[in-house]
Amino acid sequence: MEHKRIVEKSPEEYKTISRSVMLCLILAVVDQITKDAVVNAIPMYSKKTVIPGFFDLTYITNPGAAFGVMEGKGILLLTISMAVIVAMIIFFRKLCDGWCERYYALLLVVSGVLGNSYDRIFRSSYGKFCDGEVVDFLSFHIGDIPWAVWPSFNVADTAICVGVGLFILSNFIRPEPEKNDAEKKSA
């Protein structure tokens, strides 16, 4: 079966966009529901073992980005996040290049950015607007080996990583976009 690009502004493209936007919204809601469940069920810095020696639910917060980078820079992180979303919206069709999986990939990233941005805006323990911390709770490890612990993360982080990975993979396996006549002449 030959995989073809989706034609811009076609019913197929609108259907793909609708489905990927729906997935984006569902994941953003699931992210917040799971974070609320953890906040209400597990005391801060505590854990509930799900699979002994491998997987725990651990309630922690992260005042920065991935791995604690840019700690305490909530406004800057929000500004960067919103700039990324705006750029993705402006260049959405160009970035997708008609490949179905790229629509989903980009909107997975948007979903994760929205989920973590919500935390930065509304989950402030000090009552300051836009000074919140992201709730992380998924904790994987191998036994009690100190170097075999992955930093805790959440549904939004997962959506971002899967979206970025899918987009990169798509760029490796899909052909380059065809150049139009003007681009061919200048090359």
Report each predicted region and the residues it spans.
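Alpha-helical transmembrane bundles and membrane-interface segments of multipass inner-membrane proteins
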Residues: 1-187
